[in-house]
């Protein structure tokens, strides 16, 4: 009895008896200790380890070791699959979700056909069956393209803060925005080069056509401007011309008709300097005749009339044509050209010359 009592009291109070109880079930204790350590280190706060009383069977009151052994085994075997499979953290879930999205996007892009186009229009062959991993082309939405085009209109090159801001605004990555702007700059460069080449090839014929159509109008405008300039000069020096013509009429009786005809030409050369392109012969003849008529009417003397008649005989239309044929064949060709003077233009010149004569009659 005493031995049993000592044994019982020693079993309850003494530490060696507790050590004996702990070492009496070595496989069970090792299994529970290792599993609880693994589960606590792997799961940190997600998995709660079993209580201390369950790990040590001798401290659990009213439980026999034999009865507790089958209870401990299933509890010990539960953390083992958790230890073999690591728990899922939020960053792991995001990674798996992105992988799933990539696989679904690849399936969606490869199903319609083996070739698909980017927003810029360049095709790319998709690797449907091959295992090679190629970077997928970004399919931009209409709103994203609109905002990117708007930004490109104002800024061809983006600074990094603005690029980050646009990427966050349009739900794109910074790399996608950078690559889009690179491609858009190259597209803009190609478009400008094509436009320059097109305009460079198309400019000469357009200028020739415009020149061919506007030759007649420009010629008449030049002649009208020159006539007006000559009028201004003649109005500035009316009295000098009258004195010159009077002297010429006095010298006409003493000298030959040729000298009388040469002197008005000298005065008319001043007015002919204003004509940059005196290609047609008819305006030249009319301008040479008109000042002579004006001088004759201003003087009113019969000698001046004789000189003017001689000028008319010398510088008739036929003589002008013969002179032009003798000087240059291009002038005769210009008369036969379709840009030649019409009756309306001739009437216009005659009317202007008559107005010139009427103005000088007042003096």
From Swiss-Prot:
One of its GO terms (biological process) is regulation of transcription by RNA polymerase II. It is found in: Nucleus. GO terms for molecular function: DNA-binding transcription factor activity, RNA polymerase II-specific; RNA polymerase II cis-regulatory region sequence-specific DNA binding. The keyword Transferase does not apply. GO terms for cellular component: nucleus. Its main location: nucleus. Residues 100-109, 252-266 have a biased composition (Polar residues). A motif (Antp-type hexapeptide) lies at residues 88-93. Residues 133-192 bind DNA. Residues 193-202 have a biased composition (Basic and acidic residues). Residues 42-132, 186-218, 245-279 are annotated as: Disordered. Keywords: Developmental protein, DNA-binding, Homeobox, Nucleus, Transcription, Transcription regulation. Belongs to the Antp homeobox family. Proboscipedia subfamily. Sequence-specific transcription factor which is part of a developmental regulatory system that provides cells with specific positional identities on the anterior-posterior axis. This is Homeobox protein Hox-A2b. It comes from Danio rerio (Zebrafish).
